[in-house]
Amino acid sequence: MKDIIYIKNLRVQTIIGIFGWEREVRQEVSIDLEISFDCKKAAKTDSIEDTIDYKKITKNIIKFVEGSSFQLQESLAEGIAKLVKNEYKSSSIKLRVSKPGALRYAEDVGVIIYR
């Protein structure tokens, strides 16, 4: 059984989309992230140094997303995944990126990737 550290419904404004107006107006994206991580050592030591710092990873994701300008959610998701994998050396992650309200009649639309 693997342990999971997660961040759910992180909402960030960015330039994303293929239409002209989407290249000019920041839109909200929602991010869910699950990181496989062995939590045993952190549970034993009760030390932040032995786990993934939620605040730090959230700040890094926000900085990356706010500074990015992608046409596709797939590209944004891949960029976030690379950031997380490089920074935290996780064996695997599950990442969901969505654009709330992007499609009429749908709550949101997005992509889920596993790395």
Where do the language-model regions lie?
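N-terminal, polar/charged subdomain of small-to-medium soluble alpha/beta proteins
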Residues: 1-115
